[in-house]
């Protein structure tokens, strides 16, 4: 009995420690500057101001990370004329994107349906941007052979019909950037679809020459190592790269890994992504092509996530196309599932994803019925409690019987307290005589721990709960309770539940158990309100069930 109780206490303490560390990593990696700590003098504010064309021209060529690839074809000389790049702004119902005509790079992505701060309704979330304080951009091009992009050639100098595009009442908006080579015309086409964060990037090559035209499509995500400011006790979720490989459906490649050396893999299809809390950017190259992936740190100190597709060849006097998808938006599980296999795994539900994923679908279904995520969490808690009703009842019956045996156990302790072996033997005889399973109160609780851990990660990772209100003072279920009312209620319910449990025979164990409500209350003050809400409701239901069972057993004598 003692070893199992000790194991249960140890398991709870270990889980608490792990969750606390995940929540309190703000003190680590101080050598990496955070975005919030950058100097105040920023040349281009995140959203309100649009960088000038001159700024675009200088920033676009600052990082020489264009791949130099070998393709058997007649090279095309770079144009000699003076080129003035332009910044193209595209606005849909969910995105505002800024594209540089010098290379056709994505320099800024604003998510119009997501706020940077819930307190400011006029400030949408800026996912990607480039200014003096921060670099996070996406690039793509055609390199090698006849391609206009390259480390030596520089970037393709595109022209555009206009610099502002809006979706309006249409389902799609198409932005064409054009480039005239000596014997070919290249159109880089961006297609934006209503209510979608996936941008189709397609190259249309019209070969006017008598020889084949050939180049390789590449795409890059370039980001510095700065991290968002999470604030005091703020959770530090994973920020870094992730990729799918032939061996592993989802593999993280951290910035530290790239500091140690490049990560390379070649496969058919696939994807490469940069993930952060709630949001993701990802290149999804041609699914039927063999693509080479490389994740590395550049000489400029930025992290480069790159794919290079196989050679695209266009026959003489023919038209050819090659395209890739670029996603920049929230980590919505259903959207990501539709885009590419295993891309939904970037929603990091931890090693218990196979439990957390069904929990989210259940929560999402309930939310569709009630329209409030807080109410949905309460109803999901009731559902989970119903699933574990009988295992919990077994546990509470065992605990109630153990409470009845405490006077006899105390008597045995006085009689055989110095002889632990004799004491253990007499306890087992007592359990057998009274038909009590000393393990019955612990095992059902251990069975429920994976569900709690899964629910923790599900609530932490679900962008759907970001900035979502419950009622009254709780206006965001994804952050801590501002008044700490829920954590205090959680501590009270834990204390009441302990009073219904048998007192551990070991004084040290008893002291540890007495301190747990206080420790958990302090810890949960900094947990998301949605998670604490689950715990409070679960404890309340458990108290009700345990009280009824304990009272019935005590009445039965």
Curated annotation (Swiss-Prot):
According to the record, the segments passing through the membrane are: 1-21, 346-366, 369-389, 439-459, 470-490, 517-537
Q: Which Pfam families match?
A: 60KD_IMP, YidC_periplas
The yes or no answer to whether the keyword Zinc is present is no
Which molecular function term from Gene Ontology is one that the record holds? membrane insertase activity
Which coarse location class describes where this protein primarily resides? membrane
* Keywords, in A-Z order: Cell inner membrane, Cell membrane, Chaperone, Membrane, Protein transport, Transmembrane, Transmembrane helix, Transport
State a GO cellular component annotated for this protein.
Answer: plasma membrane
Q: Which CDD domains match?
A: 5TM_YidC_Alb3, EcYidC-like_peri
Q: Give yes or no: UniProt keyword Protease.
A: no
Q: What is one process in the GO biological process aspect for this record?
A: protein transport
| Subcellular localization, as worded in the UniProt entry | Cell inner membrane
Provide the residue span(s) of the region labelled Disordered: 52-71
Q: How does it sit in the membrane?
A: Multi-pass membrane protein
Q: Its family?
A: Belongs to the OXA1/ALB3/YidC family. Type 1 subfamily.
Give a short account of what the protein does. Required for the insertion and/or proper folding and/or complex formation of integral membrane proteins into the membrane. Involved in integration of membrane proteins that insert both dependently and independently of the Sec translocase complex, as well as at least some lipoproteins. Aids folding of multispanning membrane proteins.
Q: HAMAP family recorded for this chain?
A: YidC_type1 (MF_01810)
Q: How does it assemble?
A: Interacts with the Sec translocase complex via SecD. Specifically interacts with transmembrane segments of nascent integral membrane proteins during membrane integration.
Q: State the name under which the record lists this protein.
A: Membrane protein insertase YidC
Organism whose genome encodes this protein:
Saccharophagus degradans (strain 2-40 / ATCC 43961 / DSM 17024)
């Amino acid at each position: 009995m003692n070893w199992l109780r000790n194991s249960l206490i140890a398991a709870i303490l270990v889980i608490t420690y792990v969750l606390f560390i995940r929540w309190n990593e703000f003190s680590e990696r101080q050598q990496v500057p955070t975005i919030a700590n950058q100097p105040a003098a920023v040349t281009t504010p995140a959203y309100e101001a649009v960088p000038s064309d001159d700024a675009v021209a200088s920033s676009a060529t600052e990082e020489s990370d264009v791949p130099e690839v070998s393709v058997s074809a007649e090279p095309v000389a770079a144009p000699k004329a003076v080129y003035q790049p332009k910044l193209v702004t595209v606005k849909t119902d969910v995105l505002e994107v800024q594209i540089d005509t010098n290379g056709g790079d994505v320099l800024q992505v604003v998510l119009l349906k997501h706020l940077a701060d819930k307190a400011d309704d006029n400030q949408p979330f800026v996912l990607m941007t480039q200014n003096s304080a921060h670099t996070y951009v996406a690039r793509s091009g055609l390199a090698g052979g006849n391609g206009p992009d390259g480390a030596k050639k520089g970037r393709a100098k595109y022209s555009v019909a206009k610099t502002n595009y809006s979706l309006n009442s249409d389902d799609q908006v198409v932005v064409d950037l054009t480039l005239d080579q000596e014997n070919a015309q290249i159109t880089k086409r961006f297609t934006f679809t209503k209510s979608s964060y996936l941008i189709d990037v397609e190259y249309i090559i019209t070969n006017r020459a008598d020889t084949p035209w050939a180049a390789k499509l590449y795409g890059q995500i370039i980001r510095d190592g700065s991290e968002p400011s999470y604030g005091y006790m703020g959770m530090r979720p994973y920020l870094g790269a992730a990729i799918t490989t032939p061996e592993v459906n989802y593999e993280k490649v951290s910035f530290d890994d790239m500091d140690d050396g490049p990560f390379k893999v070649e496969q058919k299809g696939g994807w490469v992504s940069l993930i952060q809390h709630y949001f993701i950017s990802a290149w999804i190259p041609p699914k039927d092509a063999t693509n080479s992936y490389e994740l590395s740190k550049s000489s400029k100190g930025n992290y480069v996530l790159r794919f290079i597709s196989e050679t695209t060849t266009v026959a003489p006097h023919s038209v050819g196309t090659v395209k890739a998808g670029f996603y920049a938006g929230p980590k919505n599980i259903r959207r990501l599932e539709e885009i590419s296999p295993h891309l939904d795994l970037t929603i990091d539900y931890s090693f218990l994803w196979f439990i957390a994923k069904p929990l989210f679908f259940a929560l999402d279904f309930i939310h569709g019925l009630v329209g409030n995520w807080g109410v949905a969490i309460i109803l999901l808690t009731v559902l989970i409690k119903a699933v574990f009703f009988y295992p919990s009842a077994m546990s509470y019956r065992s605990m109630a019987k153990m409470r009845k045996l405490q006077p006899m156990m105390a008597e045995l302790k006085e009689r055989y307290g110095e002889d632990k072996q004799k004491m253990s033997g007499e306890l087992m005889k007592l359990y057998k005589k009274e038909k009590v399973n000393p393990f019955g109160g612990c095992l059902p609780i251990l069975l429920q721990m994976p569900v709690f851990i899964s629910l923790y990660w599900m609530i932490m990772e679900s962008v759907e709960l970001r900035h979502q209100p419950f009622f009254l003072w709780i206006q965001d279920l994804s952050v801590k309770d501002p008044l700490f009312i829920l954590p205090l209620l959680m501590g009270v319910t834990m204390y009441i539940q302990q009073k219904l449990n048998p007192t551990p025979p070991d004084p040290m164990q008893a002291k540890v158990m007495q301190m747990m409500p206080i420790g958990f209350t302090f810890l949960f003050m900094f947990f998301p309100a949605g998670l604490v809400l689950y715990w409070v409701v679960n404890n309340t239901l458990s108290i009700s069930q345990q009280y009824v069972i304990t009272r019935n057993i005590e009445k039965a004598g």
